């Protein structure tokens, strides 16, 4: 209940003094995103269920929930049972790390069988890859996409240009976007960087 109350406190402001997900001004039922770190570690899965149950007890549920994950964490049976029992939409945003970009070894980072489990829990999701202009990065990304497709994951693919700072993104983002569109992928920008800079808490 402490974590749920902290989340409610975070969305309190002058126009939403009680911290309601159903915003009193826009009348829009807002979204709750679990990010990290890695929110689908075993302790994270347990915490999410507790947070949801407490928000439900307070009659203050979000319109939908997203899990921002690297797609390597197996779902516990208890989490799957809970996810299948609730009416709130669950969305998985999976961002597998590429060796050519992050140095993460493929056998650790690319887990199609695990992401396929997520897709069975919810048809709502996406695969998101951080990619630059280099051909080897694109080749690795498309090899990974093929593995996810073979496992039955048919979520859309989003490409996020490399670069944590706005000037880094601006330098190559156009070329990355052009490549993505030609290959039938979507492009994701780091909007928070444009708005607030690469600062903690944004």
Residue ranges and their predicted role:
Residues 22, 27, 40-202:
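Conserved AdoMet/S-adenosylmethionine-binding subsite of the radical SAM
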Residues 1-33:
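Conserved alpha-helical substructure of the radical SAM core
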Residues 36-37:
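Active-site beta-strand/loop signature of hydrolases that rely on acidic residues for catalysis
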């Amino acid at each position: 209940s402490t974590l749920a109350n902290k989340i409610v406190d975070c969305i309190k402001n002058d126009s939403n003094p009680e911290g309601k997900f159903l915003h009193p001004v826009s009348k829009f039922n807002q979204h709750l995103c679990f990010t990290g770190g890695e929110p689908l570690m075993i302790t994270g899965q347990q915490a999410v269920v507790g947070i949801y149950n407490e928000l439900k007890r307070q009659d203050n549920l979000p319109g939908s929930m997203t899990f921002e994950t690297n797609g390597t964490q197996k779902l516990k049976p208890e989490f799957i049972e809970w996810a299948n029992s609730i009416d709130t939409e669950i969305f998985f945003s999976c961002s597998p790390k590429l060796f050519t970009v992050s140095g993460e070894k493929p056998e650790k980072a690319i887990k199609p069988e695990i992401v396929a489990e997520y897709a069975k829990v919810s048809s709502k999701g996406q695969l998101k890859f951080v990619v630059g202009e280099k051909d080897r990065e694109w080749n690795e990304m498309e090899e990974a996409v093929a593995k996810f497709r073979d496992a039955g994951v048919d979520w859309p693919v989003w490409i996020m240009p490399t670069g944590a700072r706005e000037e880094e993104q601006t330098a190559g983002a156009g070329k990355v976007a052009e490549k993505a569109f030609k290959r039938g992928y979507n492009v994701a920008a780091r909007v928070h960087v444009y708005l607030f800079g690469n600062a903690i808490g944004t």
